[in-house]
Amino acid sequence: MQTAMGDDIIDRISSRLLREPEAFDPAAGMLPDWVPDTPPGRPPVPAAVLIALVRRAEGLSILYTERSPELRSHSGQIAFPGGKVDPTDSDAADAALREAWEEVHLQRSEARVLGFMPLYYTGTNYLITPVVAVVEPTAPFIPNPGEVRSVFEVPLDYLMTPGSYSTFHIKRGGREHSTWQIEHSGLVIWGITANLTRRFHDLALQPETGRSAEGG
């Protein structure tokens, strides 16, 4: 029964995703999630993250990592597996799956890419392509201690509930900036990861309007 219900949800999500990674159009004037006082003055850095829908006996969940406290940037924060798109990566999906293997030993053969969410531009000048995939693991995920402190999953049902989200306010450059925040099992997901999770929530619950997602 859980498998049938899970398949229905997966089909629904898949129908709302882009079939190909969204191309960046510099002329479109895309704004970042927050605007720094000093614009970077260089093209944004392509990056990709994996939003992994993990199939378990009890239902679907989404995979997150707790970054190592030893990392120079975003240490100790909650994140999706992912990172910069390397020149050797064929596309965003290739980059996201490579990073997932390097970070948590997620086997590429156990992942089926459903599609892509619209680009997410960060105030730190990263242009992120969220890659959505169904994962059916045959072994536990193993954190790479050089990058990841721990790995955990949050039930999809919980993340599809609007009441699971609140807003979090921080200051950058003397200006207040708000992000989404998710609390679960004593852990707090905020910033880019929470914003992307909320976008995924909104995308999954939006009315059916066509074969693939539009906007973000």
Which residues are covered by each model-predicted region?
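NUDIX/MutT-family hydrolases
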Residues: 143-185
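N-terminal leader/linker segments that precede catalytic domains of diphosphate-processing enzymes
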Residues: 1-79, 84-138, 172-216
